[in-house]
Structures are given as C-alpha cells and as structure tokens.
C-alpha cells in the first residue's frame, strides 16, 4: 500500500540515500534535514520502501514553492512525483503554488502540465545553457 506523509528525522538517512543516488553526491543532506525539522518535507512510501520525497518553502514572494521533487530511480514513471505534488497542493493554504525545472528536464515539464501548472517565467544563468522554467498552479 502506498502512502504520503510528513517526513520525520527517522527518514533522513533513507531520503539522503535516494537524493545521493539521483544527483551523485550528498551536497543536499543539510537542506533535507532542515526541511524535515521544519516539517516541509513529504515522503512517498510503498510498504516499507521510501520511493520519493518533496521539499517546499513558503517564502517565494509570499507564496509556496516546491523546491525539490526526488523519486528513486527504480520507482520512476509510476506517478510518484505527481502524487507528491498533488498531496502538497491539496494541503497548502497558498492561493498560488510555484515550482521550477530545467528546460532540459522534459519529463518534469510534462508532469507540471498534466497537473495543471502553467509556465510563469524563465530564469537564465542558474545552470549554464539550461534555463530554469518557473511554473505556477493557481488555486
């Protein structure tokens, strides 16, 4: 049975392991821990297996921002990112939810579009040659 819940510190090691598997290093471990401590991290699990997580902030020009959605490579293309985003959007009190992805990440662009997010802008120069596309979902 799959479920989404707020992550606790007991999940930190598993979430960091998934993140490291995806990006190849542990550079975001402190960010993940802080998000867990501040209750800004949702996780998706299937039985006892954590398959993905989402980190959010509430300080994007006064609106909520989904800053990170990570799915374990072996669990991709199964709707986990969509489930995490939908769960977050359903619980937020914000009138607008923003997120972003690189122009090269067409899979995530399709996820946002399928969930009713629309393009809101572009930020150049974060990653050389790969602009960041900002998306918004208006409640």
Label every PLM stretch briefly:
Residues 57, 100, 120-123:
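Solvent-exposed beta-strand sheet faces enriched in polar/charged residues
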Residues 2, 6-68, 72, 85, ...:
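Acetyl-CoA-dependent GNAT
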Residues 68-76, 101-102:
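A short, internal acetyl-CoA/4′-phosphopantetheine-binding micro-motif in the GNAT/acyltransferase core
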Residues 91-103:
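Conserved GNAT acetyl-CoA-binding A-motif
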Residues 125-139:
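C-terminal "cap" of GNAT-fold acetyltransferases
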Residues 103-121, 130:
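Conserved active-site alpha-helix within GNAT-family acetyltransferase domains
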